[in-house]
Amino acid sequence: MLIGSLVELAWGEIDSEPIIAKIASEEIKIISLTITEGGYKVDFNQSRSVFWYVAEGLKRRMEKDLPITILSCDNMQMNGNVARCAFMSYFEAKYPEVAAWAKKKVTFPNSMVDRITPVTKPGKVTDVCCEDFIQWVIEDNFIAGRPAWEKVGVTFTHDVTPYEIMKLSLLNASHTLLSYPAYMEGFRKVDAVMADERYRA
């Protein structure tokens, strides 16, 4: 499958300017993030973190008063709230003028992403395996507008909480229930368990 949404790549370790300029660009309305749970831990001494790149871009947006949405796509409950807390704490400590502006001009919608993708092994970074099922639920809180993603299956809602509770109660709980007896029998991967007719039944 070709992922056609990737049209440009910038490597900040080599040159930070293209990333900052893109964040500052008037055509950009949404910054989407997938930085894992650990990525939201703010290290105020780290010179080039995701928080720094975004803050530098927002400084320029602030000059033209261009609002923007920061959309966390990480697998955490209330990920938008987590993102808001992390970014705002960084802004308040390092960029107080950006913090004051962002309170009114930046939104952080919560989202729930559900599609299992196993950890990529060394030497196989080009292979991305995933299950067939996919669900993406997003709080409809986009200050600068958004694409019509509902046309391709995204669910927009005012509150993602019921969807998160459903996922935790039905999906995560059933995975856990399946894992215990399978592990006792020597299974170490869920796909191998599901290939066993006794468990699949």
Give the residues covered by each predicted segment.
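Substrate/ligand-engaging "lid" and interaction regions
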Residues: 1-201
